[in-house]
Amino acid sequence: MTQTEVKELLNAGVHFGHLTRKWDPNMAPYIYMERNGIHILNLYKTAAKISEAQQALKKIALSGRKILFVATKKQAKDIVAEYSKKINMPYITERWPGGMLTNFITIRKAVKKMGSIDRMKKDGTFETLSKKEKLQVDRMRSKLEKNLGSITDMTRLPGAIFIVDIKRENIAIKEAQKLNIPIFAMVDTNSDPRKVDFVIPSNDDASKSIDKVIGLIANAISEGLSERKIEKEAEMKEAEVKKDEVKEDEVKEAEVKEAEVKKAEVIKAEMKEDEVKED
C-alpha cells in the first residue's frame, strides 16, 4: 500500500483499538502504542496485511469459488451487505444459522424450499391453498429469506469466509476451522488473531473503519472476478477457433476423399475403354 492509502486508513480511524485493559496479548505485534488508555494499531502492518488478504482473495475469486462474508453487528451489517451484493458474493448479516457450514446439506434444503415456494406462486399452486395455509407459507418464506436469502447462489461450501469481529462470530469461526475453510477477518485489539488465517488488525467497531477495509477487500475480489471473466471469454474464443479449424480439416478431408473417388472412377472408366478396344 502507498503512503496515501495508509493515510486513508488513518482518516477512517482504522488504527483505534480497545481499552488497554481489554486487550488480547496475542495482538501485541500489531500494536504501535497506547494513548489515553486505548491501544493504537500500527497502520503500516495493517496495510501489509490488507495487501496480503487482497492477493489471496483475488486468487480465490479468480478460481471461481465463493467468499462468504459474515457480519451480524449493527454497525457492520449494512456495509457488508452492500459490498457483497456489488461483487455478487454470499453474506450473513442476521443471526448465524447453526450448521451453516458443518451441516451445509440441510441449509441447502432450506434454500431450495424457498425456490419451491416461489415456483408455487408462479405456477398457480399457491392459489389453491386455503387462506391459513397461504399465511403459513408466506411466513415461512419471509423467515427463510431473512436468514438465508443472501446465500441462495452458494451451491457449495465457500472457498473462504471473511469475518468482521471474530469475538462475536465465534460459531462461524469454529465451523470454518472444522472444515479447513480459510478465515479472513478484521481483528481488533481485544481478539485472538491465532484463530484466523489472514489477520487484518483493525478497528472492527466503527462503521467508517469497517467501510474502508471491506471496500478495499471487495475491490480486490472484483478484480479477480473481472480477470476470470476475461479468461473465460478467451477460452470460449479459443474453443470456437478450434471448432472452426476442425470443421476446415473435415471439409479438406472430404474434398480429398471426393477427389480420390473421382480419380478412381476415371481410372476405372479408362480400364473399361482399354478392354473394349482389345475386344
Tell where the protein language model's regions lie, with residue ranges.
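Short glycine/threonine-rich loop/turn motifs
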Residues: 172-230
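Long, charge-patterned amphipathic alpha-helical coiled-coil/hairpin "stalk" segments used as oligomerization
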Residues: 90-196
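Intrinsically disordered, compositionally biased charged tails
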Residues: 1-7, 223-279
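N-terminal cationic and glycine-rich segments that engage phosphates or anionic surfaces
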Residues: 1-66, 72-73, 77-120, 131-134, ...
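Residue-level signature of catalytic and energy-coupling elements of molecular machines
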Residues: 13, 69, 161, 213
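Short beta->alpha junction loops/turns
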Residues: 46, 72-73, 166, 189, ...
